[in-house]
Amino acid sequence: MKIDVLTLFPDMFTGVFGSSILKQASDKGIVSFQTVDFREYAANKHRKVDDYPYGGGAGMVLSPQPIFDAVSALTKNGKKKPRIIMLCPQGEQHSQQKAAELAKEEHLIFLCGHYEGFDERVRHLVTDELSIGDYVLTGGELAAMVIADSVVRLLPGVLGNDESAVTDSYSTGLLEHPHYTRPADFRGMKVPDVLLSGHHAKIEEWRMEQSLRRTLERRPDLLKGYEPTAKEADILKRLMDKQE
């Protein structure tokens, strides 16, 4: 996969793309990252990328020309059209399902806005508009980092154990079960006996119940579109009966 980021602040991505899972994915050749300062594509003497809004109002608007030219340069040799993602608070809220969808692509281009955002005509380039929450950030850079991380970790070979991505919270439609490691007793807080039993069927049942319990208690909205198995339905009924 190739990921390009159009931004006025490329240095913001150095630590993120050069650390942890994203760096490992890059080192393995699974993904390549490129940050592009779209100021370099501004067709004016002073490399100006913004201007006053027509009709008046506060703030400055990012001009379309540098973005169009930068995207053109990034896609001129491509055989397949990339997904061009604008980060903006008006966009579709990012989700695990969206991350899985984007992980199937060969090329992603992130457009990171600033100031009052992009000139509306930039949307003619865009395939997706994404947000990471109902709040406003200074720019799209942090959102691009979040989405890139959520996508890359789903690529085959990125995680040490591919099952890790499958069992993460939201991947199954539910919140993940609790995790424990050594010691078995830490300051009087003990690991549940079932996890020490070595009985794999009972452990899986415990994890299933804990996952359903957490989802019911913390994110019951996730259960609205969830289709439980017969066993999960029985556990859910028992948990809901206890709540009444």
Curated annotation (Swiss-Prot):
GO MF assignments: tRNA (guanine(37)-N1)-methyltransferase activity
BP GO annotations: tRNA N1-guanine methylation
InterPro entries linked to this entry: Alpha/beta_knot_MTases, tRNA_m1G_MeTrfase_C_sf, tRNA_m1G_MeTrfase_TrmD, tRNA_m1G_MTases_N, tRNA_MeTrfase_TRMD/TRM10
Substrates-to-products reaction catalysed: guanosine(37) in tRNA + S-adenosyl-L-methionine = N(1)-methylguanosine(37) in tRNA + S-adenosyl-L-homocysteine + H(+)
Subcellular location: Cytoplasm
Subunit field text: Homodimer.
Matching PANTHER family: TRNA (GUANINE-N(1)-)-METHYLTRANSFERASE
Family from the record: Belongs to the RNA methyltransferase TrmD family.
Functional summary from the UniProt entry: Specifically methylates guanosine-37 in various tRNAs.
Protein's name according to its UniProt entry: tRNA (guanine-N(1)-)-methyltransferase
Organism: Shouchella clausii (strain KSM-K16) (Alkalihalobacillus clausii)
